[in-house]
Amino acid sequence: MKKIPRIGVGGPVGSGKMAIIEAVVPILIKLGYRILVITNDIVTTEDAKHVQRTLKGVLIEDRIVGVETGGCPHTAVREDPSMNLAAVEEMEAKFPDTDLVLLESGGDNLTLTFSPALIDFFIYVIDVAAGDKIPCKNGPGISQSDILVINKTDLAPYVGASLQVMDDDSRMMRGKKPFVFTNCKTNEGIDDLVHLIRENVLFDTEVSKESA
């Protein structure tokens, strides 16, 4: 069986992890990729149901599953990812033609990371509404994630946040690691995020041709 790449999508409650997934999946599917989505909630599978409703007609419901973790969000994706590993392996066996798995963690804090046994690539999502000081607060999600997504750029003027400050601090904390500003309502930045996924996770040779 081929090794299917897995992306972990983490971040604080309400940062827009699910919205990011719902934005990138249709684009990836249009490009010909076959996707699985796995979500985490503590006592429900509400996120999975939301994704199923939003992506109805785009991604079949059977390719979207929710995991009820019953406890701390980071435990289920880091210290003891057994429930998620079982879900991923079951879905991959059911859909062996899959090209990419997107696994959303439950909402957590700046210390969130994923077990390397569970994922191959880490996207961390923060939102502008939480304030422009978030990048400089650092934490594993800010500095160690493979891609940092700064979501909800449209809210900056309403909360007095400076996107330039967030840009400067992200560069300082992340060095050469990529980050992208997004607005899921207008799809601002989503194409850039998909480009990074294709280039760094799916190793799509067409990306370099498109950039030329």
UniProtKB/Swiss-Prot annotation:
One Pfam family from the record: cobW
Tell me if Iron is a UniProt keyword of this record. no
Task: Give the residues the record marks as binding GTP.
Answer: 11-18
One GO biological process this protein is involved in is: urea catabolic process
Quaternary structure per UniProt?
Homodimer. UreD, UreF and UreG form a complex that acts as a GTP-hydrolysis-dependent molecular chaperone, activating the urease apoprotein by helping to assemble the nickel containing metallocenter of UreC. The UreE protein probably delivers the nickel.
| Compartments reported by the entry | Cytoplasm
Which keywords fit this entry according to its UniProt record? Answer: Chaperone, Cytoplasm, GTP-binding, Nickel insertion, Nucleotide-binding
Organism encoding this protein: Brucella suis biovar 1 (strain 1330)
The record's family statement is: Belongs to the SIMIBI class G3E GTPase family. UreG subfamily.
Q: Does the keyword Cell membrane apply?
A: no
Annotated GO molecular function terms are: GTP binding; GTPase activity; nickel cation binding
A GO CC term attached to the entry: cytoplasm
Give the source lineage, highest ranks first: Bacteria, Pseudomonadati, Pseudomonadota, Alphaproteobacteria, Hyphomicrobiales
Q: What does this protein do?
A: Facilitates the functional incorporation of the urease nickel metallocenter. This process requires GTP hydrolysis, probably effectuated by UreG. Disrupting the ure2 operon has no effect on urease activity, or pathogen survival in BALB/c mice when inoculated by gavage, but confers slightly enhanced resistance to low pH killing in vitro.
* NCBIfam families reported for this sequence: ureG
Listed name of the protein: Urease accessory protein UreG 2
Residues forming coiled coils:
none
